[in-house]
Curated annotation (Swiss-Prot):
It comes from Anguilla anguilla. Residues 334-352 have a biased composition (Low complexity). The keyword Disulfide bond applies. The chain crosses the membrane at residues 37-61, 74-98, 114-133, 153-176, 203-230, 253-276, 285-309. The keyword Membrane applies. This is Rhodopsin, deep-sea form. GO terms for cellular component: plasma membrane. The modification N6-(retinylidene)lysine is found at residue 296.
Length: 352
């Protein structure tokens, strides 16, 4: 074995020299230089400085403005809540542990940090699944008399939390486990060992099939059909120009969210799967650390995409920040008509 396995950790370094120590008790500076841990702490602190305000603002603005409380926005709010879970449950602890060079909060802290990080990522993924299905229903009209309303949005929210917890909770109750990963300053699911005592192999396979491959397949199907339908509608001019423009705006926003999610999480998932399927292979701590911490940046991009691409939300946000006034009203005015149409039409379907 090219690593050292303990009762509750796995370190990607052989202990032939005797320098390997528990990541819960000793600084791990034999894995990387102290300055690397300082950079890690600074990076995570930056994510907190950006992630908390932008996600909190998303929640506050939506609650403040009644016209933003549409079924579609319920799911987008769910993304903001998931991101705040990651910020408070994962980022803050990682800043502190990186400054010390090891996971100072012990096994219990590792379980909590791993749970919140996994929960936030899974809520985001399943929220994107619900958004993809919503876009498919609204634009492709597979059920001509179906109307996507508040009750469907609430059921979608419940679904995302149930699925996310079905992935994040088992390691807390003996099916797999959370352990320090990479440079040993943050925790995640154990991809490094088979650990038959906790049936680790079966959980990792379950996680990759049910909580990664299945949602990506659903998203791919929905947007594959979506692209075809949008092209056909544009060619036949079945909808009014204003409605088409509003639907395109929302669809583009959701598609970009999905692409950004894949850019952030696919490298992490790919590296994790490689490590799991190549047990005993040699890899350095940075090999897992870089994609892991790159994936954490996902807590920032969704609200930024929403703010940049949704003109109605952007106008409400500016109004909130400037105490009821919008100094950029003339610039925002050009898209007001499309925004109003979007609020009333993108989450409903009239008979085909």
């Amino acid at each position: 074995m090219n690593g050292t396995e303990g009762p509750n950790f796995y370190i990607p370094m052989s202990n032939i020299t005797g320098v390997v120590r528990s990541p819960f008790e000793y600084p791990q500076y034999y894995l990387a230089e102290p300055w690397a841990y300082t950079i890690l702490a600074a990076y995570m602190f930056t994510l907190i400085l950006l992630g908390f305000p932008v996600n909190f603002l998303t929640l506050y603005v939506t609650i403040e403005h009644k016209k933003l409380r549409t079924p579609l926005n319920y799911i987008l709010l769910n993304l903001a809540v998931a991101n705040l879970f990651m910020v408070f449950g994962g980022f803050t602890t990682t800043v502190y542990t990186s400054m010390h060079g090891y996971f100072v909060f012990g096994e219990t802290g590792c379980n909590l940090e791993g749970y919140f990080a996994t929960l936030g990522g899974e809520i985001s993924l399943w929220s994107l699944v619900v958004l993809a299905i919503e876009r498919w229903v609204v634009v492709c009209k597979p059920m001509s008399n179906f109307r996507f309303g508040e009750n469907h949005a609430i059921m979608g929210l419940a679904f995302t939390w149930i699925m996310a917890n079905s992935c994040a909770m088992p390691p807390l109750f003996g099916w797999s486990r959370y352990i320090p990963e990479g440079m040993q300053c943050s925790c995640g699911v154990d991809y490094y060992t088979l650990k038959p005592e906790v049936n680790n192999e079966s959980f990792v396979i379950y996680m990759f099939i049910v909580h990664f491959s299945v949602p990506l397949t659903i998203i791919s199907f929905c947007y594959g059909r979506l692209v075809c339908t949008v092209k056909e509608a544009a060619a036949q001019q079945q909808e009014s120009e204003t409605t088409q423009r509003a639907e395109r705006e929302v669809t583009r926003m959701v598609v970009i969210m999905v692409i950004a999610f894949l850019v952030c999480w696919v490298p992490y998932a790919s590296v994790a799967w490689y490590i799991f399927t190549h047990q005993g292979s040699t890899f350095g701590p940075v090999f897992m650390t870089v994609p892991s911490f790159f994936a954490k940046s996902s807590a920032i991009y969704n609200p930024l995409i929403y703010i940049c691409l949704n003109s109605q939300f952007r106008n409400c946000m500016i109004t909130t920040l400037f105490c009821g006034k919008n100094p950029f009203q003339e610039e925002e005015g050009a898209s007001t008509t499309a925004s109003k149409t979007e609020a009333s039409s993108v989450s409903s379907v009239s008979p085909a």
